[in-house]
Amino acid sequence: MLLAIKDFFNSLLLKELFKGMALTGRYLFARKITVQFPEEKTPISPRFRGLHALRRYPNGEERCIACKLCEAVCPALAITIESDARADGTRRTTRYDIDLTKCIFCGFCEEACPVDAIVETQILEYHGEKRGDLYFTKDMLLAVGDRYEPQIAAAKAADAKYR
């Protein structure tokens, strides 16, 4: 009964309303943290999962061994791989496509890869005017990997103790 009376007076005096207004007032005069995005950029974590890339070994050979683990583990079914056997008995990919309109950027493909062939870079600014522009082929993924290899290697090194 006493609790009901206390609740009645609190609601009658609009205590919750004033607590909310006090909180709003506190943030109204606090320092603003808005970032003007195209001109200013916030730091990106080494674990950020952005645009995909295929990597090469230092001798120039592509890392992907066509094990298809990334294709199997992808929950969105965004990866398509085709492969052929080479003369020395190893397999290499003939087709490696990622449909970024399906991809959910979960990072499972990167975790499943035994040779670190597929990685997600820190690139977050990419777009397409048509739906097909977000369909990345093997050559496009290798070009991204070649262009950003120093950043990819630095991010891998920064994250090495957590892997």
Curated annotation (Swiss-Prot):
It is found in: Cell inner membrane. GO terms for cellular component: plasma membrane. It is a peripheral membrane protein. [4Fe-4S] cluster 1 binds at C64, C67, C70, C113. SUPFAM superfamilies: 4Fe-4S ferredoxins. It catalyses: a quinone + NADH + 5 H(+)(in) = a quinol + NAD(+) + 4 H(+)(out). Keywords: 4Fe-4S, Cell inner membrane, Cell membrane, Iron, Iron-sulfur, Membrane, Metal-binding, NAD, Quinone, Repeat, Translocase, Ubiquinone. Its EC number is 7.1.1.-. Residues 54-84, 94-123 form the 4Fe-4S ferredoxin-type domain. InterPro entries: 4Fe4S_Fe-S-bd, 4Fe4S_Fe_S_CS, NADH_quinone_OxRdtase_chainI. One of its GO terms (molecular function) is 4 iron, 4 sulfur cluster binding. GO terms for biological process: aerobic respiration. Its cofactor is [4Fe-4S] cluster. Binds 2 [4Fe-4S] clusters per subunit. NCBIfam families: NuoI, PRK05888.1-4, PRK05888.1-5. Belongs to the complex I 23 kDa subunit family. NDH-1 shuttles electrons from NADH, via FMN and iron-sulfur (Fe-S) centers, to quinones in the respiratory chain. The immediate electron acceptor for the enzyme in this species is believed to be ubiquinone. Couples the redox reaction to proton translocation (for every two electrons transferred, four hydrogen ions are translocated across the cytoplasmic membrane), and thus conserves the redox energy in a proton gradient. NDH-1 is composed of 14 different subunits. Subunits NuoA, H, J, K, L, M, N constitute the membrane sector of the complex. HAMAP family: NDH1_NuoI. This is NADH-quinone oxidoreductase subunit I.
